[in-house]
Regions:
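Conserved proline-anchored active-site loop of SAM-dependent methyltransferases
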Residues: 82, 97-111, 122-126, 133, ...
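Major-groove DNA-recognition helix of helix-turn-helix-type DNA-binding domains
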Residues: 15-41
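Class I S-adenosyl-L-methionine
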Residues: 323-355
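Polyanion-binding surface elements
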Residues: 1-20
Length: 355
């Protein structure tokens, strides 16, 4: 016979959360554990299951998730390289993930497809983008209905009909304020414009109005119902915040993996596209971000930051080397548009900065 102790006691003994103990029990990874009502009982001689990575990888987990919008600076092409730098500390388990510049969420959705974090925080300063995340999470049926109606109306039209429809939708989007009553309509317009505008670009003028012209797509997929439903399910336990990246500070601790993907520092005059919103992310903002990273580094969090490599065009530019001299700076290959028109692309280096 075994002497049994509670999940709370074994959690304290193993220095992990009680919820994580329950997950191990449900997966059958704790030998002879048994459930009594709503409580798990564990033999007091049980051995802690070994996690070889900081987060638990499930080889047979979930359907692949994709970003539901295209976003400037999106990390779709870099996900495989980013994954290599997800920290691994043997049995050290990171249970929380934070992405304060979520954008299109390429790494977020890769992580949601493969890993189980107990708590996830995403944020962005773009209120239209965050509204879309919230609507996908909370009102996906209504959203799919509206996007399906838009797709059925827009795709069969000739060019003149499409132009009228597109610019009418753009005017409506710019005029519509986000409220509880308008959130779904605003999100549907946001996604429609993203799928049909030039180069999938999100750009606003000084008044904060979306001003990208219509793109030339033969048969755009405006409503990807399966992906939207899968993303909605995956977001149910994700905290979504609209605001400055510094708001994530209270969430971040020693058990957190943090990925920061801010607006990149321009490497040329034409590459400096940071008009995701009406505010500018200049060198002073890059310095403020570095100070924030210094703060969260003190918490014991594992940190990964992406940015441009100014030495692509100026080998003497040591801006980031000076700013992050206390960190490990890796250079990774990327293919980027090097002007705002998106018609000049090439292989360049980007920086991946880790603590």
């Amino acid at each position: 016979m075994f002497d049994y102790i509670s999940a709370k006691d074994i959690a304290n003994k193993w220095n992990i959360s009680q919820r994580r103990v329950a997950i191990f029990c449900m997966e059958g990874r704790i030998k002879d554990a048994k459930k009594l009502g709503n409580m798990w009982l564990i033999p007091n001689t049980a051995e802690k299951p070994i996690d070889k990575r900081t987060i638990r990888y499930e080889k047979h987990k979930k359907i692949e998730l994709k970003p539901f919008v295209k976003w400037v600076g999106g990390k779709g092409q870099l996900v495989a390289q980013l994954e290599k730098h997800i920290p691994a500390n043997g049995e050290k388990v990171l249970t929380k993930y934070a992405e304060p510049f979520v954008g299109g969420g390429a790494l977020l959705f890769n992580i949601l497809s493969k890993y189980n974090f107990e708590e996830i925080y995403i944020g962005d300063i773009n209120k239209e983008l965050i509204n879309a995340y919230n609507v996908v999470k909370n009102n996906v049926d209504e959203l799919i209905k509206k996007l399906t109606e838009m797709q059925l109306a827009f795709v069969p039209m000739d060019e003149n009909g499409r132009k009228y429809y597109y610019y009418t939708a753009r005017d409506r989007f710019n005029a519509l304020q986000i409220t509880a009553e308008t959130a779904v309509e605003k999100a549907s317009l946001f996604i429609f414009l993203n799928k049909t505008c030039f180069n999938g670009l999100y750009r606003v003028n000084k008044k904060g109005q979306f001003n990208v012209p219509m793109g030339a797509y033969k048969n755009p997929t405006i409503c990807d119902e399966n992906n939207l439903r899968n993303v909605s399910e995956a977001l149910q336990n994700v905290t979504i915040v609209c605001g400055d990246y510094s708001l994530s500070k209270d969430f971040i601790d020693k058990d957190t993996f943090v990925y920061l993907d801010p607006p990149y520092r321009p490497i040329s005059e034409t590459a400096g596209f940071t008009a995701y919103n009406a505010d500018c992310f200049d060198d002073n903002e890059q310095i403020r971000l570095a100070r924030f990273i210094d703060e969260i580094n003190l918490s014991g969090a594992k940190i990964m930051l992406s940015n441009s490599d100014p030495q692509n065009v100026n080998p003497e530019d040591t801006f980031f080397e000076d700013l992050y001299k206390a960190y490990t700076i890796n250079k990774v290959d990327a293919t980027r548009a090097i002007n705002s028109k998106g018609d000049s692309r090439g292989k360049i280096k980007e920086l991946l900065i880790c603590n």
